A protein has these predicted regions:
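Short-chain dehydrogenase/reductase
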Residues: 2-88, 100-113, 117-121
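Conserved Rossmann-fold SDR core element
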Residues: 26, 90-92, 152, 189-192, ...
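A short helix-coil junction within the Rossmann-fold of NAD(P)-dependent oxidoreductases
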Residues: 29, 87-88, 101-105, 139-151, ...
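A glycine/serine/threonine-rich, flexible loop-to-helix segment
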Residues: 44-49, 108-112, 165-169, 201, ...
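Catalytic loop of short-chain dehydrogenase/reductase
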Residues: 101-104, 116-119, 151-201, 213-214
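A short, exposed helix-loop element centered on a Lys and neighboring polar residues
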Residues: 137-138, 193
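C-terminal helical subdomain
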Residues: 208, 226-292
Length: 292
């Protein structure tokens, strides 16, 4: 029997992409899932063009709570939190996966320079990625504090933490043109490092993970737009992977606690998968993605 059998896991950004894969992964392990997202209506974009997934969750309604939430709104978060406790009585793990993608804020390519942005662009990005993550965490961590055990897993981005190889720590910008998005992820990473230290006394593990290059909702449209303007969508070294490559490490971290497990760490999912015999990016390659 899985250690996650019967555990209650809340997942933000659960309707599509990485969140969808994570929800399915937890259900396969026998966990009960609070699936949180701002919209459960298919967007029609690549990877999100039918409602079969929602129907699949509705069949498992004893083990799943589908909840519509705007994590940047405290009242919306509170409503979802109350609904989760009413249905399952507690929360054992929170997976912070929701964010505002740059391609949604600056369609269709997601590219913009710092001087081209407006204050409102940064406020929207940080409102979801940083303050939204804080609001949902601050609320859903309460049952974990009460039961003296829990786990917080937060998805960031490789662009949030870049270092040069050679011994000395040297910070550098991400290779992407996604300043607001990567800045929000960097702020979230720092926040989670501090939170891990602060809630260790409650036996709550707090960890972050960096996804590989994932083919998520709108990925194809973004690459088409970048190709149309003469920008190479991805280098030959980057392989577009299925969101499912995120699942094994997420499941592992969900079962951690601060006293006997791993906490305060940031993991590169691709490297972790290879180290644990789960394959290289080629193993997880999406056959329908752009050829690499």
């Amino acid at each position: 029997m899985s250690n996650l059998e019967g555990k209650v896991v809340a997942v933000t950004g659960a309707a599509r992409g990485i969140g969808r894969a994570i929800v399915k992964g937890f259900l396969a392990e026998g966990a009960k899932v609070v699936a949180l997202d701002m919209s459960w209506t298919p967007s029609g974009l690549s990877g999100d063009d039918n409602d079969d997934y929602v129907k699949e969750l509705e069949v498992k309604q004893e083990d799943v709570l589908i909840s519509t939430v705007d994590i940047s709104d405290s009242l919306s978060v509170e409503r979802s939190y109350i609904a989760a406790l009413d249905k399952f009585g507690t929360v054992d793990t929170l997976v912070n996966n929701a964010s505002l993608r740059q391609r949604n804020l600056f369609p269709p390519t997601g590219k913009i320079t710092t001087l081209e942005t407006k204050d409102s662009d940064w406020e929207k990005m940080f409102g979801v990625g940083v303050f939204g993550t804080l609001k949902i965490t601050r609320r859903f961590i309460q049952p974990m504090i009460k039961q003296n055990r829990g786990s917080i897993v937060t998805v960031i981005s490789g662009g949030a933490m870049h270092t040069a190889i050679g011994g000395a720590y040297v910070a550098q910008r991400s290779g992407s043109s996604e300043g607001p998005y990567q800045s929000a992820k960097a702020a979230t990473l720092t926040m989670m490092f501090y939170l891990a230290y602060e809630v260790r006394e409650y036996n709550i593990a707090v960890n972050t993970l960096i996804p590989g290059n994932s083919r998520t909702t709108g990925y194809d449209e973004q690459n088409d737009a970048r190709r149309a303007e003469g920008t190479t969508p991805s280098s030959s070294a980057r392989i577009s992977m299925r969101p499912e490559h995120m699942v094994p490490l997420t499941l592992f971290l969900a079962d951690q606690d601060a006293n006997s497990g791993v906490t305060g760490k940031c993991f590169d999912v691709t490297i972790w998968n290879m180290e644990h015999g789960l394959g290289s990016p080629k193993t997880w390659r999406d056959p329908d993605a752009d050829p690499a």
